[in-house]
Curated annotation (Swiss-Prot):
Protein name: 50 kDa hatching enzyme
Repeat region (Hemopexin), residues: 384-419, 428-471, 472-517, 522-574
Positions of the record's site feature: Cleavage: 450-451, 503-504
Domain commentary: There are two distinct domains in this protein; the catalytic N-terminal, and the C-terminal which is involved in substrate specificity.
Residue segments, region Disordered: 333-379
GO molecular function, one term: metalloendopeptidase activity
Lineage: superkingdom: Eukaryota
Annotated source species: Hemicentrotus pulcherrimus (Sea urchin)
CDD domains cross-referenced by the UniProt entry: HX, ZnMc_MMP
GO cellular component: extracellular matrix
Annotated cofactor note: Binds 1 zinc ion per subunit.
Family designation: Belongs to the peptidase M10A family.
Amino acid sequence: MANFCLIFAAVFLTRLTTVLNTPISVTFGPTQLTDITKLVSETGDDFGLTTPRSAILTTVSEDDSDDDDGGESVEDTTILQTTTSSEIVISGIVVDEDIDESKVVKLKANLEQFGYVPLGSTFGEANINYTSAILEYQQNGGINQTGILDAETAALLDTPRCGVPDILPYVTGGIAWPRNVAVTYSFGTLSNDLSQTAIKNELRRAFQVWDDVSSLTFREVVDSSSVDIRIKFGSYEHGDGISFDGQGGVLAHAFLPRNGDAHFDDSERWTIGTNSGTNLFQVAAHEFGHSLGLYHSDVQSALMYPYYRGYNPNFNLDRDDIAGITSLYGRNTGSTTTTTRRPTITRTTTRRTTTRRTTTQLATTQTTTIRPPTYPTPPRQACTGSFDAVIKDNSDRIYALAGRYYWRLDQASPSWGVVRNRFGFDLPENVDASFQNGIFSYFFSGCYYYYQTSTRRRFPRTPFNRRWVGLPCDIDAVYKSGDSGTTYFFKGRFVYKFSSSNQLQRRSPISSYFRNTPYALRDGVEAVVRVDDVYLHFYRDGRYYRMIESTKQFVNFPNGLSYRDVIDTLIPQCRSLNLSVEIESCSNSSE
């Protein structure tokens, strides 16, 4: 009977694959997998399933006896994939049959070089989901997302591009040069394709692109011993351990602050103002974006898009580029030199000092005329407005956690307190992230999670890998989908998508997974919370960004809304405390 069911399922899937002309993924438990493998061996028919050709995409093992969602523990599962008649499978990668096998090797090299799979991966490794990696590669390249090596993907492999990875290892956010200090650069060995003067002028013009829209200023220096950005041309191995590949392919690469150096492949034919060769100005402006702290963009019209699109005589920065650079350095206020910006800071300090003296009286009046506090003044570290986690309970009360403390963000009855006193004495001092799922509240810290019911029944801490296999420690934020039961975890620049059965389905850069992602969120978020059935709020650096959950689209791009003001409004004591702190700092600076 079991064999009959398996045959029926296999034949049905094969027919459905033919009708839809698309691959289909199926999950079998270990017992069924043994049966179907035996069946294939006995009959000599693989029924269109790719497993006999080593196309196993993902194997997940989980033993979770504490499944509090009411579901059963997940068995060892193997995901199999059917293919259409026009596709073949090579080492775990589904390939259109008219694609040369050499492209498979090149695709794997690209996926490694640009951060989609670990370096040194072996073809067909069961723990590497090449389909997911290809989907991300296609999404960042702005082409159709099929998850297979098709003609469009093969063409993208041959497109000249920047050598900086699309997916960088985890780095802390906000990497940038200090504001109000000119960024210095120097010239090293230059190309012989053009005159030295012409090359330097184009490179200066590339810096000016970023100067025009931000508060940045640049200064050219001759001594390269202590310069911020060193510029040079070189071929193949050129001294930084990241070799160029000859003409075509990688055109240049650069390093993020506080290195910032930019290198250009001297094997390219660099040109100025012509469609032939490779336009020096456009490539340099892109690389200097990296030198200033920008990552790649999946917006095809953006300068920071990783692929070279040819000479554009009407070049302008895209809105996405401007949002990125101003999120790091602020907008150009009209000042053109570092020295003209410094007096602005002094004037601001003076004005704020005067204002603070006035509002100090208001804060004093507030404690006697508006609403007497029923709780003591919060400690200063609880008034920063920087949250570790945000959670909404079953009564629709929203709590923001900051270190040892929490805020209840409620216009009618705002309050604060110690996290352990409100949520449980067995919680750690610092919670990384949290979310609500039915009657359960989940809290994450380090490599462990804690959970309790709405009746305050608590469960012991549990390692991540008991429930979410593949989730890294020290996550930044988490939320659970309202309809599908999917859970999204955030760590650095990545979002980890887990199915309702807690299987890792995908790891993607935040910027490529959500639509219209604000630049401030591309290298990480502080917290996420569902505020109602429509919107999620993403918190970062004193601001929150609203996203429609059903479409995964941000709606107040690019600047967000301030939640520092929310704290000031809801918690009068915090506002009073912060004002007194600022008065003290202003008084000290004026002495």
